[in-house]
UniProtKB/Swiss-Prot annotation:
The lineage of its organism: Bacteria, Pseudomonadati, Pseudomonadota, Gammaproteobacteria, Pseudomonadales. It comes from Pseudomonas putida (strain ATCC 47054 / DSM 6125 / CFBP 8728 / NCIMB 11950 / KT2440). In the N-terminal section; belongs to the enoyl-CoA hydratase/isomerase family. In the C-terminal section; belongs to the 3-hydroxyacyl-CoA dehydrogenase family. Pathway: Lipid metabolism; fatty acid beta-oxidation. PROSITE patterns: 3HCDH (PS00067), ENOYL_COA_HYDRATASE (PS00166). InterPro entries: 3-OHacyl-CoA_DH_CS (IPR006180), 3-OHacyl-CoA_DH_NAD-bd (IPR006176), 3HC_DH_C (IPR006108), 6-PGluconate_DH-like_C_sf (IPR008927), ClpP/crotonase-like_dom_sf (IPR029045), Enoyl-CoA_hyd/isom_CS (IPR018376), Enoyl-CoA_hydra/iso (IPR001753), FA_oxidation_alpha_subunit (IPR050136). The active site is at residue 451. Residues 312-715 are annotated as: 3-hydroxyacyl-CoA dehydrogenase. This is Fatty acid oxidation complex subunit alpha.
Length: 715
């Protein structure tokens, strides 16, 4: 053994060839943390000191290569002054440089995934051989930063600036064949031949058949582009990427600027440019929010995994109610491998559901994400039925009938008598109390809510609602099934609107107040889209459906009359009464035309102003900042109440629910992190400025206490 640590070992393989193996003890994956970096330095020193070493193969002792840097250490590191961050990155890069500068050839054998620092380690090697099943990429832009261990320096010099910009700015994982095509790897082999492939490359380099020094040299030099080529490549890329990323996500464009600035430098000076830009991004609020989201997502996954121990295996599912929603649920279950019965009382609804599933599967085939054979397999896994004949062996039933408590109670009671005693019943309701629906059941312990968001195939969130009598097994089984469907489940307790809709309707309430105060809804949409929402509140209402919003508003007003009941007519009332229901019937706040792709396109329709005129009670002058606060303050305060009321267990789950469920701007991190970014005391003072607008704007006593004590939701 040449070197042995807790994360890295170096040992002889054969005739002067050594293996530098990453295998971080006590962890399921390899990652770059302080320990790993320190051991890499020691391992490289040990290799350099051993005259018998003729070549080095870098590989992993786990199912994946290296997943990147340890994000938990980012939180502490990014609090350091900018100069210390730069120094830390340069120190890490000296370790990578020392490996790259070894006097012997090096080969990285890539299995599983090599992301971020994992790929940057591979780029420091002379050659890379990749398993056919492996994936590589530099996803740092998704955290509001860019690669900091040499990725913006080595990758452009290896695969060309255009390809490197595409890889870095997109932050996607890349398949082996794509990596080989652009020259990011030198060979692709079957997983079982990975070590043999690496040995073949290293032996050819040792023998002189391959010139490893010539292979290494371009990574040490400036980019091979003249001034005109640089201007064309970088300026065009910056314009395109800025348009794609938008103004709230600076990292992709900053990565291009770093590559451009370092283009005429050799490796060491170029790495200094990279480190300086990395440190600047690391200190932004965007990076703080996106890293916070990543950590929150990891927390969600840990909590969901904790349910696995007692969850029952779902081998056969069923959905009650076909149509678009039922078809979407059936598609998601089938395409992820769980066969599902789709029942309705009407043949036309069954056909609508099957058509929806078939359309979604067809779209995946067209995009190359599914083979025709797999499409046929998924379609065969959806069994339409008009009866309960095959329900005896169903493990979970998702009820997705009309949003009416009496109808849902009747259907749930009926199906309960058709399934085995331990089958789970789950209602896909968006607002109706789970405790109320449970009253119709003989086995309420087997009943939960399972709230999918529309469209099912696109929205990542599923709210799993625990009723007063829901058993831990019922909750755990539903969480496990949601995960199996490829969704991110969050467990919430029962209340009107649960988490997401309870928080969303105060936001809509703020919007209604603005319209009643004479503020142009088109202006409101523009302001909130600029704030970061994927669509403004008027457009969102049209997409959701004015009738759906009207019904949901009434449910919330009944549940929380002290702050959500408004005696005055609102914009939603006026549109509902005028039968302007949004996209579904072509007119809501906006009118809708069909574009060339057959998609609805919104256009301004002046006739809506006459519909809204009776509900405008004043003409108040408001700034864009006022518009944001009228809407965001009640949303944030209701999120605080959900946490305080125990509807959601943690701040992480609350924020992720809003990001995944309603498109809360990710770069702002979620409602509670948004409060943190303002400062709890400052947010309370801000809310107090709008106290005259009603109880939705009144901070809770506990939040005032947090403000007084200087507390935050996230440390």
């Amino acid at each position: 053994m040449i070197y042995e640590g807790k994360a890295i070992t170096v040992k002889a393989l054969e005739s002067g060839i050594v293996e530098l193996k990453f295998d971080l003890k006590g962890e399921s994956v390899n990652k770059f943390n302080r320990l790993t970096l320190n051991e890499l330095r020691q391992a490289v020193d040990a290799i350099r000191a051993d005259a018998s070493v003729k070549g080095v193969i870098v590989r992993s002792g786990k199912d994946v290569f290296i997943v990147g840097a340890d994000i938990t250490e980012f939180v502490d590191n990014f609090k350091l002054p900018e100069a210390e961050l730069v120094a830390g990155n340069l120190e890490a890069n000296r370790i990578f440089n020392a490996f790259e500068d070894l006097e012997v050839p090096t080969v990285a054998a890539i299995n599983g995934i090599a992301l971020g620092g994992g790929l940057e380690m591979c780029l420091a090697a002379d050659y890379r051989v990749m398993s056919t099943s492996a994936r590589i990429g530099l996803p740092e832009v998704k955290l509001g930063i860019y690669p900091g261990f040499g990725g913006t320096v080595r990758l452009p010099r290896l695969i060309g600036s255009d390809n490197a910009i595409e890889w870095i700015a997109a932050g996607k994982e890349n398949r082996a064949e794509d990596a080989l095509k652009v020259g990011a790897v030198d060979a692709v082999v079957a997983p079982e031949l990975l070590l043999a492939g690496a040995l073949d490359l290293i032996k050819r380099a040792i023998s002189g058949e391959l010139d490893y020094k010539a292979k290494r040299q371009p990574k040490l030099e400036k980019l091979k582009l003249n001034a005109i080529e640089q201007m064309m490549a970088f300026e065009t890329a910056k314009g395109f990427v800025a348009g794609q990323a938008g103004p709230n996500y600076p990292a992709p464009v900053e990565a291009i600027k770093s590559i451009q600035k370092a283009a005429n430098f050799g490796r060491d000076k170029a790495l200094e440019v990279e480190a300086a830009g990395f440190a600047k991004l690391a200190k932004t609020s965007v990076a703080e929010s996106l890293i916070g989201l990543f950590l929150n997502d990891q927390e969600l996954k840990r909590k969901a995994k904790a349910h696995d121990e007692i969850a029952h295996d779902v081998k056969q599912a069923a959905v009650l109610g076909a149509g678009i929603m039922g078809g979407g649920i059936a598609y998601q279950s089938a395409v992820k491998g769980t066969p599902i019965l789709m029942k309705d009382i009407r043949e036309e609804a069954i056909q609508l559901g099957l058509n929806e599933a078939s359309k979604l599967l067809g779209n995946r085939v067209e995009k190359g994400r599914l083979t025709p054979a797999k499409m046929a397999e998924a379609l065969n896994a959806i069994r339409p039925t008009l009866s309960y004949g095959d329900f005896a062996n169903v493990d979970i039933v998702v009820e997705a009938v009309v949003e009416n408590p009496k109808v849902k109670q009747a259907v749930l009671a009926e199906v309960e008598g058709q399934v085995k005693d331990d089958a789970i019943l789950a209602s896909n309701t968006s607002t109706i109390s789970i405790n109320l629906l449970a009253k119709a059941l003989k086995r309420p312990e087997n009943f939960v809510g399972m709230h999918f968001f529309n469209p099912v195939h696109m929205m990542p969130l599923v709210e799993v609602i625990r009723g007063e009598k829901s058993s831990d097994v019922a909750v755990a089984t539903t969480v496990a099934y949601a995960k199996k469907m490829g969704k991110n489940p969050i467990v919430v307790n029962d209340c009107p609107g649960f988490l997401v809709n309870r928080v969303l309707f105060p936001y809509f309430g703020g919007f209604a107040k603005l319209v009643s105060a004479g503020v142009d809804f088109v202006r409101i949409d523009k302001v909130m889209e600029k704030f970061g929402w994927p669509m403004g509140p008027a457009y969102l209402m049209d997409v959701v459906g004015i009738d759906t919003g009207h019904h949901g508003r009434d449910v919330m007003a009944e549940g929380f009359p002290d702050r959500m009941k408004d005696e005055r007519r609102s914009a939603v009332d006026a549109l509902y009464e005028a039968n302007r229901l949004g996209q579904k019937n072509g007119k809501g706040f906006y009118a809708y035309e069909t574009d060339k792709r057959g998609k609805p396109k919104k256009v301004f329709d002046a006739t809506v102003l006459d519909v809204l005129k009776p509900i405008v009670f004043e003409q108040r002058e408001v700034t864009d900042e006022d518009i944001i606060n009228w809407m965001m303050v009640p949303l944030c305060l209701e999120t605080v109440r959900c946490l305080e009321d125990g509807i959601v267990e943690t701040a992480a789950e609350a924020d992720m629910g809003l990001v995944y469920g309603i498109g809360f701007p990710p770069f702002r991190g979620g409602a509670l992190r948004y409060i943190d970014s303002i400062g709890v005391a400052e947010f309370v003072a801000l809310a107090d400025q709008y106290a005259d607008l009603g109880p939705l704007y009144h901070p809770t006593a506990k939040l005032r206490e947090m403000a007084k004590n200087g507390q935050r939701f996230f440390n």
